[in-house]
């Protein structure tokens, strides 16, 4: 259900805007998207896991807020990110 430290580090290096960048919206959205994807796969076999479903909804909301912020601050970075992640918007 959770992502491994190696996978998280790969995402950080791929989406970082500079060296050592772990807090930019791009990195946070990429990590959240990976976690959301893993939880979505989890729900295919565990349909009644409502406790984890609440966590999924919180992650989706957090990602939405980060994307809204990025869209407001720098629309070009927002466009690049949703294209790279394959998010529909």
Swiss-Prot record:
GO terms for cellular component: cytosolic small ribosomal subunit. The keyword Ribonucleoprotein applies. GO terms for molecular function: rRNA binding; structural constituent of ribosome. Keywords: Ribonucleoprotein, Ribosomal protein, RNA-binding, rRNA-binding. InterPro entries: Ribosomal_uS15, Ribosomal_uS15_bac-type, uS15_NS1_RNA-bd_sf. GO terms for biological process: translation. Belongs to the universal ribosomal protein uS15 family. One of the primary rRNA binding proteins, it binds directly to 16S rRNA where it helps nucleate assembly of the platform of the 30S subunit by binding and bridging several RNA helices of the 16S rRNA. Part of the 30S ribosomal subunit. Forms a bridge to the 50S subunit in the 70S ribosome, contacting the 23S rRNA. This is Small ribosomal subunit protein uS15. It comes from Bartonella bacilliformis (strain ATCC 35685 / KC583 / Herrer 020/F12,63).
């Amino acid at each position: 259900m959770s992502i491994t430290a190696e996978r998280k580090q790969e995402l950080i290096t791929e989406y970082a805007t500079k060296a050592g960048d772990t807090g930019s919206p791009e990195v946070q959205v990429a990590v959240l998207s990976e976690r959301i994807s893993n939880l979505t796969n989890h729900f295919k076999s565990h349909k009644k896991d409502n406790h984890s479903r609440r966590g999924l909804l919180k992650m989706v909301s957090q990602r939405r807020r980060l994307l809204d912020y990025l869209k407001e601050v720098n629309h070009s970075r927002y466009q690049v990110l949703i294209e790279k992640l394959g998010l529909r918007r």
